[in-house]
Amino acid sequence: MASEATYDWDICDDVVVPNRGLADREGTARGEEVDILAGATVPVGLGAELFFVVTHAAGEATAAEARGADIPHGQRGPRTFTIERALIPNLMEATEVSDDPSLPDPHVQRLGAIDIDDSSHPVENLVTPSVIRHEDPAHPDEGWLMIALSLINDVDAQIVVLRSSDRQHWRVLGPLELPAEAALRPDRPFAPRIVSMVDADSSARRDVLFVTFPGGAGESDEVAGYVVGNLSGSAFKVTTPFTVIDFGHDFTRPRVIDYHTPVMFGLVGAHPSLDGQWANCLSAPRYLSLVGGELYQDVVGAPTAVRTFSDYAFIWSAQLDAQQGSVDVDVTDDSGQVIATISYTNDAVSVTRLGVDTRTAPLKDADSDTLTVFLDGPVCEVFADGGAVTLTSAIPAHSQISDIDVRATGGAKIISSMQTAGRHLMRMQAGLTSPEDQEAYMAEALIADRDVAAGIFDED
């Protein structure tokens, strides 16, 4: 659970887990649940209501055959999918950790499957529900909006729109209708999400639709983007066509917390494999702003979080003058190897892994040239020109990030810069990596404090 402190998390018991074929607390048998898949959360008083997807084995398939980890990426497999709800009446009561790690949180009340009226457009196997409160003059009595994927067959899917007055009974309006100017990719969509935001330029309220598609040649495995406009019924009127939201190697399937200022985080890596060293990493949470129909992403509070909670995270931020030349940032590990290079020029920013694998994002004219490089564990996140452009990449390294080397060449200048390091990195830079060195340093500090108090030395 997200803490009140920026980028901090409270450890909690699992909220919802598969039932392993056991009856629920009321003694009702539901059949063996194979997986629980994420969906959406909406605030309810002091608590929250959860929308999630339960999978069961289809037909004669066994639970083992229907587990998501054993099914090729992007395929339905021998599974059925059902959207259910759960309620956490009071979030603060759910922060206690029980002694038995195998049990779900007893404060969570599973409410069962939602009811779906699909008489106007039949659907089945709905997944990835995104639920928000959304006013639509065409449906004044149904103030809740859901968009979800309807799995058509083993590999195809369609985004559909549903409305509800009470979050339990839902009516399918039909498939999401987007005009040609939306410029969506023709491939199968993944993980649609929607939020409503106010554009800072026009003060107009806009709906922002996030969709992920398979990547093409020279792109990452999956490419996430957004479309801006207004949704009424199932028709989406577009004001900003599909725009890639992150140009790095590995950002995909973003989740968005619908709030006054929406917060987004994404998966780092399309699908875990044995070739990778990390799995199921998340990007840093990003505060979203809509300005002139374009999204800006900001890691507010990240320097404080790095100093307070992290051992190996590192942030470097700078204001640049790159009308000519380039600014290059080499990321080195503790063996001195350059494991990533970030390059910033007047019209592009790029990330290169191990000197050979590059992703590049175009830059528009901006009021100022700024660059932020955020490193934590295996993840490198780059924010350019105030968050107008981002690149997120996993860095394949067998050792920890140690330092950065910054160069301005060809007439480029670094006007100002700031860096923040995690606790272990600061100890490394101070030569205090061993317990003996740390004890000696603390002893010297105590002696110095005593001498100052005794008047032997002046504090200045």
Q: Where in the sequence are the language-model features?
A:
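Carbohydrate-active catalytic/glycan-binding domains of CAZyme proteins
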Residues: 1-460
